[in-house]
Amino acid sequence: MGNNNEFSSGKCPVMHGGMTSAGMASKDWWPNALNLDILHQHDTKTNPMGQQFNYREALKQLDVQALKDDLRALMTDSQPWWPADWGHYGGLMVRMAWHSAGSYRIADGRGGAGTGNQRFAPLNSWPDNVNLDKARRLLWPIKKKYGNKISWADLIVLAGTMAYESMGLKTFGFAFGREDIWHPEIDTYWGSEKEWLAPSGSEGSRYSGERDLENPLAAVMMGLIYVNPEGVDGHPDPQKTANDVRVTFARMAMNDEETVALTAGGHTVGKCHGNGSAANLGAAPEGADLQEQGLGWNNHTTRGIDRDTVSSGIEGAWTSKPTQWDNGYFDMLLGHEWTLTKSPAGAWQWVPIQIAEEDKPVDVEDPSIRLLPIMTDADMAMKVDPTYRQIAERFRQDPAYFSDVFARAWFKLTHRDLGPKSRYFGPDVPQEALIWQDPVPAGRSEYDVAAVKAKIAASGLSIADMVSTAWDSARTFRGSDKRGGANGARIRLAPQNTWEGNEPARLAKVLAVLEPIAAEFNVSVADVIVLAGNLGIEQAAKAAGVAIEVPFAPGRGDATQAMTDEASFEVLEPLADGFRNWLKKDYVVTAEELLLDRAQLMRLTACEMTVLIGGMRVLGANYGGSKVGVFTDRIGVLSNDFFVNLTDMSYTWKPTASNLYEIRERANGALKWTASRVDLVFGSNSILRAYAEVYAQDDNKEKFVRDFVAAWTKVMNADRYDLR
C-alpha cells in the first residue's frame, strides 16, 4: 500500500506537474528573448463563443430600441450596494465609457474601446479606473439579458452614450461592431515604470529631455488614462498641466477644440469622489481576495458609498446640475475665481473664492445640503491656457455650438478604433462621412480581371517592382485601430508617396505604368496595384515549378487627397520593415523586435511572418534592391532557398556591424552572403527555427509556396471588411 499521508499532511498532490502560477517561466530566465506570444493572442482556445460565432450576424437579432430603453431605465435605478449619485448613474457610465475609449493612442492604434479590454488587467485595476468595476457590474443584468447579441465592448460605449442622452445631450450617433476579447492584451506597451503613478524621473520614466513623452504613450503616468488631475507629478500648475493635456490629447488624435469640448463635456456631468481616506480601500480587482468576486477597492472599514465614496481622491462636482447636460461648466469655470485647497482624501483641487449659495451643487444624498463645486488642475488649464481659454469662451457664448462639437468629439473618441465605416452597424450610424474615418469610395467589382492582368504582364514591370509596390501599399494596415491597408491606394497620395520606406522614385516609376492601365479598364489603382503583386508571385511560383493562382477579390476604391488627413496618416509611416529588410535608422529597439511589432499590427501569426520573410527575400523585394538576406542564386524564383541555406551547417555567421552579418563557407571561409538581424533570428530563435526547418524540408517546397500565397493574400485583403 502506498503512503497517502503526504496528501493529508498538506503537501501538494500535483507535485511539480502543470505550472499554474508559481515557478520561473522561460521569460524569467531569458528576459531578452523574442516574445512571439504577442502573435498568438485571442485564438479559439480562449474564446468561449467558438469559431462559428459571427458577432455581426448576432447583432442583426438585437432589439436596439429595447436595449436603449433598458439602459435609460438603468440610469435612475439606484442599487443599494452601489447607490447612484443624485439618483442617476449618468456620470459613472460616462466615466466608464470615457476611460474605455480614452486609452487609445494614435501612434500605434492600440488601446481604445474596441475590444472590451477594460474588463481585464491591467486596465481593470488602474488607479484611474477605481470603481469602474462597479459600473460594469451594474450593467451585468442587461448584458445577461441580451447575451451574445451585444458585446461588452459595444455595451460599455453605448451605456456612456445613452447616459448623455438621458441627461439631455443630442448625441451624434452610435455604431455597433466592437468584438470582445477574452484575455488581457499582451502586445500593448503601457510604459516601463515599476510603480503606479510614478512621477517623472522615477525608474523607467516615460519622460526625457525637457518633458518629452515617450512614444507611443499618450498618458502622463502609469495607471492614468490621460493627465494627472492634481497637476504635473501631483503639483498644481494649470499652464504646465495644459501642456500635458495638449500632448496627451494630440496623441489621442484630438485637436485643441475637441480637447476643450471633451474636457468640458466630460465634467459637465457627474462628480469626483474623495470624501474619505484611500487607505481604507482594499486591493484593486486583480489583486482582491476570492470572496470579493472580481470587485476591487472595497471599503470594509468605513461606509465607503454615496457621499463617502473614494475614487480619484478629489471631492466634488463641477457644475450646479451634475445630472443635466447644459453649459454650466463654462459658467462655473469662467465666471468665478478659484483657489487651491485639499480634499478630505488629501488631493489637490480648486474651489471658488466666492460663489452664490444657489450656484452650489447639492449633496448626493441630501438635497438640502449645498457644497462647494470643484475644478481639477486640468479644468483650470482650460481657463489659464490662452488657446484653450479662447475656445472655452466661444463655447460659453454658443451652447448649441458646444453641444454639437462635443457630440462629434464624443463620437470620434468612442469610434476612433472601430475602423472604416464599412465596419459600422446599427440604426444610429451617422450618414455623414468624416475624414478621420479614412473614407474610401466603393470600387468596381465586376470587370475582366484576366484582361487587366494580361495588360500588366505585358507592361515590362519586374517581379520585384510589382511585389514591392503591392506590399508597401498593404503593409500600413493596423489591426489595432483598423487603419491603413491597400484599399484606397493612398500610397499614391501625400504623405505616403514621399515616405522613405516607399522608395518614392521607384514608386513613381511603377505608378506611371499601373495608373494608365487602371484608367484604360476603368478600375481602381488600388485593385491594379494588388493584382500586379499577385501576378509577380504567380510568375515566381511558376519559375519554381508550382502552378498557382493567387486569390484576388476586386472591388477596392481609390481615395482622393481631399479624403486624406495627411497629419493623421503620418503615424502610419513605417520606420522599419523587416519584410523588406529595411531600417530607417538604428533604434534602441532591435530590428527583430520591430519586425515582431509590425507583424502583430498586421495580425500575422509567427508561421505567416516566417513564410513571408522567406518568400520576400527570394523574390528580390528588399528595399533598394539590397542583397542582404537574399540567400539564393535564383532571385525571382519563389523557392525555399532562404530556409535551406539559413539552416545549412556548411556556413558560419559573423557580425560585421550593428545590423549586419557575414555568412561564410565553413570549409574555406569564403564569403557567401550577408544578413541582417531579422534574417538570422529565424535561425537563432528556437521557435522561429522550428518553422524555418519545416520550410527548408525537401518535401515542403510546394507547401512553402502555398503557405506564402495564403499569407500574402491575408495581407492584401486585411482591410477588406466588405468581404467579411
From Swiss-Prot:
Keyword Oxidoreductase (UniProt): yes
GO BP field: cellular response to hydrogen peroxide; hydrogen peroxide catabolic process
Record cross-link Tryptophyl-tyrosyl-methioninium (Tyr-Met) (with W-98), residues: 226-252
The reaction(s) this protein catalyses: H2O2 + AH2 = A + 2 H2O; 2 H2O2 = O2 + 2 H2O
Sorted UniProt keywords: Heme, Hydrogen peroxide, Iron, Metal-binding, Oxidoreductase, Peroxidase
Organism listed in the record: Edwardsiella tarda
Protein name: Catalase-peroxidase
Residue numbers marked as site, Transition state stabilizer: 95
Subunit structure, interactors included: Homodimer or homotetramer.
Similarity field: Belongs to the peroxidase family. Peroxidase/catalase subfamily.
Ligand binding (heme b): 267
Extent of the signal sequence: none
Active-site annotation: 99
Entry's cofactor comment: Binds 1 heme b (iron(II)-protoporphyrin IX) group per dimer.
UniProt modification remark: Formation of the three residue Trp-Tyr-Met cross-link is important for the catalase, but not the peroxidase activity of the enzyme.
The protein's role, per its UniProt record: Bifunctional enzyme with both catalase and broad-spectrum peroxidase activity.
Cross-link type Tryptophyl-tyrosyl-methioninium (Trp-Tyr) (with M-252), residue numbers: 98-226
Principal EC category: oxidoreductase
One MF annotation (Gene Ontology) recorded for this entry: catalase activity
Documented EC number(s): 1.11.1.21
Cofactor field: heme b
Gene this protein is translated from: katG
GO cellular component: cytosol
